[in-house]
Amino acid sequence: MELNVTTLEGKAAGSVHLSDGIFGLEPRKDLIQRCVNWQLAKSQAGTHKTKGRAEIWRTGKKLFKQKGTGNARHGSARAPQFRGGGRAFGPVVRSHAHDLPKKVRALALRHALSAKAKDGGLIVIDSVELKEAKTKALMGHFSSLGLTSALIIDGAQVHAGFATAARNIPNIDVLPIQGINVYDILRRQKLVLTKAAVDALEARFK
């Protein structure tokens, strides 16, 4: 498929051929969902914790004698049924990460790229080099391109001036090509690729 290339200023800069094997697939929501769930589970802290009955600081003495009081048979005040007792089967610190095959992750990325291309949310620009690293000037460029929520992917090295100018703009994420991922693609309305990023993706999936 052919896609027009623009500059940061919004001017035409030719066109680029995009591989149908990367940008022309019929998106599969099940693959994309599996990859997003994998990413979010992997990033979850898992620091939730409550104390069990073995961790509560309280006397272990039997509350009252076994027989003759008419009360239920209790042994320890640390038991879960008492106020201040330990939690039964409470959450513990653990990792929520689970495995997802590399081939499934790679396929999900291609389907996420295809979904953006199909919805018209894919933009290709020639370069992100700026004459001066000014946030105000860059916001003007984004306004001319109609970018209010976008993920911008550059080549192996993001232009330093561009990264500096863009870091304080809300809803704008800038990543090198190594950092491209399904979740960040989906959480922004537009996906902006430089020609260097397109070449890197073509080389990666050829």
Curated annotation (Swiss-Prot):
Record's keyword terms, sorted: Ribonucleoprotein, Ribosomal protein, RNA-binding, rRNA-binding
CC terms in the record's Gene Ontology section: ribonucleoprotein complex; ribosome
Pfam families with a match to the protein in the record: Ribosomal_L4
GO MF, any single term: rRNA binding
GO BP field: translation
UniProt keyword annotation of Metal-binding present: no
NCBIfam families hit by this protein: rplD_bact (TIGR03953)
Assembly behavior: Part of the 50S ribosomal subunit.
Family per record: Belongs to the universal ribosomal protein uL4 family.
Protein function: One of the primary rRNA binding proteins, this protein initially binds near the 5'-end of the 23S rRNA. It is important during the early stages of 50S assembly. It makes multiple contacts with different domains of the 23S rRNA in the assembled 50S subunit and ribosome. Forms part of the polypeptide exit tunnel.
Protein name, per record: Large ribosomal subunit protein uL4
Lineage, uppermost ranks: Bacteria, Pseudomonadati, Pseudomonadota, Alphaproteobacteria, Hyphomicrobiales
